[in-house]
């Protein structure tokens, strides 16, 4: 059985349900885990830090789909992505769609938008601009093409003195794929995007937070 030295867990659709309510059983289970638990989310830094504090896990957080990393609650955000490239791509999309931006002033590495247009058509419009358009299941994110949760996980792992291959990761959407690629063991919850399940070493029987509990049980982290 794979024995991780740390875990990275997505938030929306993994620890929460479709209404973004945290699963209390998952929270209780994560508090019992004796190895570092890192939240890896598409959300902004202040949200991720607050969630980590509320849940009771590590202060280390991966935010904005890997575009921002923070190692201490009161520390500084380390920005890994170029937001300006993303803004330029948004300007192109605005010529074709009604684009509704989300949390624009708080995002440091990417641009987040309401899921109100065809993502595949939009991807063609911004092709070659050095960005990628990702669907988190809750919003669209235009990200620097050099940014991913996977690269951020490798960055974090190096700082922690371990390999990303010693991480187990739990997620639900396509923005978790790169994280699954670099981790030692990837677990998709039952409600996960079918594309993510193709990269998973395990798919839990239950969705979202209940699936997280099952994942931790499978890894032998709940005693």
UniProtKB/Swiss-Prot annotation:
The EC number on file is 3.1.3.18
Lineage: superkingdom: Archaea
Q: Which residues act catalytically here?
A: 10 (nucleophile)
Instruction: Name the residues that bind substrate.
Output: 149
* Record keyword Amino-acid biosynthesis present: no
Could you say which residues bind Mg(2+) here?
Answer: 10, 12, 172, 176
What are the record keywords, sorted? Carbohydrate metabolism, Hydrolase, Magnesium, Metal-binding
EC class, as a word, reads hydrolase
An annotated Gene Ontology molecular function: phosphoglycolate phosphatase activity
Q: Which cofactor does it need?
A: Mg(2+)
Q: Which family does it belong to?
A: Belongs to the archaeal SPP-like hydrolase family.
Functional summary from the UniProt entry? Catalyzes the dephosphorylation of 2-phosphoglycolate.
Name of this protein: Phosphoglycolate phosphatase
In its UniProt entry, the species of origin is given as Archaeoglobus fulgidus (strain ATCC 49558 / DSM 4304 / JCM 9628 / NBRC 100126 / VC-16)
């Amino acid at each position: 059985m794979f024995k991780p030295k740390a875990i990275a867990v997505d938030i929306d659709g993994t620890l929460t349900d479709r209404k973004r309510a945290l699963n209390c059983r998952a929270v209780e289970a994560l508090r019992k885990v004796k190895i570092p638990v890192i939240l890896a989310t598409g959300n902004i830094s202040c949200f991720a830090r607050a969630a980590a504090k509320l849940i009771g896990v590590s202060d280390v957080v991966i935010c904005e789909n890997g575009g921002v990393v923070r190692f201490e609650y009161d520390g500084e955000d380390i920005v890994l992505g170029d937001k300006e490239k993303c803004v330029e791509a948004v300007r192109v999309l605005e010529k074709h769609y009604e684009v509704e931006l989300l949390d624009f002033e708080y995002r440091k590495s990417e641009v987040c938008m309401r899921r109100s247009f065809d993502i595949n058509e939009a991807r063609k419009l911004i092709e070659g601009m050095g960005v990628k358009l990702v669907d988190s299941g809750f919003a669209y994110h235009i990200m620097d093409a050099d940014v991913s949760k996977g690269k951020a996980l490798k960055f974090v792992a190096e700082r922690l003195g371990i390999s990303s291959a010693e991480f187990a990761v739990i997620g639900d959407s396509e923005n978790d794929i790169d994280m699954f690629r670099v981790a030692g063991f990837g677990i998709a919850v039952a409600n996960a995007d079918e594309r993510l399940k193709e990269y998973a070493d395990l798919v839990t029987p239950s969705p979202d937070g209940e699936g997280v509990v099952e994942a931790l049980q499978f890894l032998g982290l709940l005693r």
